[in-house]
């Protein structure tokens, strides 16, 4: 089974429509939240609406061996939520797949 919707953008469209229009404020925010004890949640906010976030979560779950979901946050909109501290993994994966450039990633947390 292949992921079909991760690379839906045209590589030549940047010259036509401007740079980085697929990311809302130009940044992808990666946050970590403490749950109970040693358990944490990693949230990813700021990815373009043109990507299917459920397919991205499905791919991340397989890649990182963790559970995840897409939640509707009242302030941030649709947010990816992954179990565990996946900040470094998600940064490397987003740049490897081409969904974000390294200078667009903003990591928050401890």
Curated annotation (Swiss-Prot):
This is Eukaryotic translation initiation factor eIF1. Gene3D superfamilies: SUI1-like domain. PANTHER family: EUKARYOTIC TRANSLATION INITIATION FACTOR SUI1. The modification Phosphothreonine is found at residue 40. InterPro entries: SUI1, SUI1_dom_sf, SUI1_euk. GO terms for molecular function: ribosomal small subunit binding; RNA binding; translation initiation factor activity. GO terms for biological process: cellular response to hypoxia; formation of translation preinitiation complex; regulation of translation. GO terms for cellular component: eukaryotic 43S preinitiation complex; multi-eIF complex. Coiled coil: none annotated. Keywords: Phosphoprotein, Protein biosynthesis, Translation regulation. Belongs to the SUI1 family. Probably involved in translation.
């Amino acid at each position: 089974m292949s992921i079909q919707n991760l690379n839906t953008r045209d590589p030549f469209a940047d010259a036509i429509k401007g740079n980085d229009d697929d990311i809302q404020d130009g940044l992808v925010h990666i946050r970590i939240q403490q749950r109970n004890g040693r358990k944490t949640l990693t949230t990813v906010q700021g990815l373009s609406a043109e990507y299917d976030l459920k397919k991205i979560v499905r791919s991340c779950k397989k890649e990182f061996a963790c559970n995840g979901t897409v939640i509707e946050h009242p302030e941030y909109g649709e947010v990816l939520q992954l179990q565990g501290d996946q900040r470094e993994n998600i940064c490397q994966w987003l740049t490897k797949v081409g969904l974000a450039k390294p200078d667009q990633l903003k990591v928050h947390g401890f």
